[in-house]
């Protein structure tokens, strides 16, 4: 009887699990946790934590570009407080591909948590290594893998599965855990005619489905788009049409990371006897890395320096450049405003913008197109022209992925909230129980056993803003001040008072920036000065001599008056000088 009780107790708390040929003993009390730190309810800064017991792996560490109201902010990265609190438990960072929204935060993460092994495919790590060196971060712990490779990290075994995307060498992940299998698709689509001839690995996903998948995390970016995403190869057909019609130079702007797109430009240039010049720092870096690693095939005599373009007839030159998003300092944008010192737009140039605007960049792209047209260029843009296709799976491809993997639980990831909801409904429409689908949010802790999934808590999460060299030192209060300055300007009120605060020794003087032009608003400024004087005298009459109280009264008095007269609320900065 005692033996039976002991055996029952052991069975209750301990189980034996065959795992990659080895046997592991694990306490059932330990749960599998999945914690998104970015990439849900937003486009960008993708980052997901997988935890079992005292072992953690991190999937991707991306950045996002600032929203319009984030004035002066350069980049946004995930809040990694949870990782800092558990840094001794992190066994590895595994990367799905080399886009900035998946690797861009790593220079900041690895500076704070060094010596973590980072695994990714060769192109992914080639791009990342350059980013780390630019930021002075050690790159010695990068470990390249190939599609089909399997690595061990703590209690996890991670497999890398080839997928098609708008960058070469992308992969999905299979993650064996003591609780069951997790599949993460990464950013993917099913391209049946890929440029490099390497399709998404259907068999690998199907085999995982046959063996049993506990949780699927899948790309939701195009969950609202019906049908199938066109093949990348169709862009090459559109390029050929444009090359055939072009009489002068061709300038093509695309994402620097889209190596297959660049390859199609090169192939078409060879066919039409045009030399290729590369413009833009990130474009030059990625092209050099891709040639070195063998992802981009370009005959040596095809590539010319940008300084050599005037040595060839215009109809024998094609320039591949950055600037497809209308970024203010990008090469194409500077060309559009005649501010590029090496390339000027000539009437008759054909400009191909081989990308669609990232949400929030529409105005920048539109302005660039207008400026190019004003200079006499022929501009080809927009999805209808066939010169761009998405790198993300549309609805029919998402259905295919679900049917291949057949998971017990599903977490839609990588998309704004409406994308995630659409993907969740799609999964439900093809037979997944609603209670097994988790529409999660950043910071939520999702906990799974073999039979049940639930939200069990929340960890610190959010956005860390990067402004120049400052990481996280700009918060909501600073942004609020910047917004106020950008909308209604600032008034600086300078008053000189005696040390004891008994009388005004000089002033007040008012300096205005971004509010009104003082010389054209003298009456307004004089009355404002009188309001300041009255506010100070009121304080002195009531024996109020604390500078902070006097400053607050000045702010309120002048703010009230200016709003009455102008319906504007400038930032008011009182300065009291002692004599």
Question: Which role fits each region the language model picked out?
Answer:
Residues 224-354, 358-383, 387-527, 531-543, ...:
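Hard-cation-handling environments
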Residues 40, 64-68, 72, 89-90, ...:
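A glycine- and charged-residue-rich anion-binding loop/surface
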Residues 1-24:
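N-terminal amphipathic/basic-hydrophobic helices that include classical n-h-c signal peptides
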Residues 132, 427, 562:
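Conserved hydrophobic residues forming the short capping helix/wall of the S-adenosyl-L-methionine
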Residues 25, 30, 517, 547, ...:
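RNA-binding accessory domains that recognize and position tRNA/RNA substrates
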Residues 543-579:
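C-terminal tails and terminal domains of large nucleic-acid-associated
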Residues 26-94, 99-311, 330-344, 363-367:
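His/Asp/Glu-rich metal-coordinating catalytic cores
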